[in-house]
Amino acid sequence: MAPAWSFLLALLLLSCNAICSLGCHLPHTHSLPNRRVLTLLRQLRRVSPSSCLQDRNDFAFPQEALGGSQLQKAQAISVLHEVTQHTFQLFSTEGSAAAWDESLLDKLRAALDQQLTDLQACLRQEEGLRGAPLLKEDASLAVRKYFHRLTLYLREKRHNPCAWEVVRAEVMRAFSSSTNLQERFRRKD
C-alpha cells in the first residue's frame, strides 16, 4: 500500500511541477520572442522613414491600455495577446504580402504565431485561476480601435509603401510599449 501512495504522490508532484512550469511567468518568457518580433519588424523596413514624413499620422496609440499603473499582470497578458493578435492579422493581409519581403514576413508571422500560442496558454491558466475574462472591455476596445485606425489608414493610402512604413513604425511602437510593460512586471517579481 505504501508504494502505491508514494507513486501517486510522486505523480502528483510531477504533474504540479509540469503545470507550474507552464505557469505564466510572462515577463521572463515573453520578452525574448517580443524582441525577436521587434528585430523582424526593423528588418522589414524598405522605405526610409524620412521619405515618409508627410505620411505620418497620429493613430492615438492606447498607451493607458499598456501603461496604466492599475494594470494587473493578468490584464497585461490579455492586452499583450490582443496587440499580438491584431498585429498578426495586419501582417497576414493580402496588402502586407505585396508590401514586404515574403521570407521576412513568414518569419514575422511565425514569431507572432508562437507568441499567440504562449499567450493563449497563459490566458487559459489565468482565467482558470480567476474564473472570469481578464481584459477590461474598455482596454480591449481601445486596442481594437487603434488597429482599426491603422487598417483604415492603409486602405485610405491604398497600401502604398510609405503608408506601410508608417504602420510598421506604429506596430514597433506598440511592441516596444509591451516590452516596457513586461520589464515593469519583471521588476515587481
Swiss-Prot record:
Give compartment(s): Secreted
Keywords from the named record: Antiviral defense, Cytokine, Disulfide bond, Secreted, Signal
Q: Does the keyword Secreted apply?
A: yes
Cystine pairings recorded for this chain: C24-C122, C52-C162
Role played: Produced by macrophages, IFN-alpha have antiviral activities. Interferon stimulates the production of two enzymes: a protein kinase and an oligoadenylate synthetase.
A GO term for molecular function: cytokine activity
Highest taxon in the source lineage: Eukaryota
InterPro entries given for it? 4_helix_cytokine-like_core, Interferon_alpha/beta/delta
GO BP terms: namely: adaptive immune response; B cell activation involved in immune response; defense response to virus; humoral immune response; natural killer cell activation involved in immune response; positive regulation of biosynthetic process; response to exogenous dsRNA; T cell activation involved in immune response
Q: Which family does it belong to?
A: Belongs to the alpha/beta interferon family.
Region forming the signal peptide:
1-23
Alphabetical list of PANTHER family matching this protein: INTERFERON ALPHA-5, TYPE I INTERFERON
Q: What is the name of the protein in this document?
A: Interferon alpha-H
> Among its keywords, does the record have Secreted?
yes
What Gene Ontology terms describe where this protein resides (cellular component)? extracellular space
Main localisation? secreted
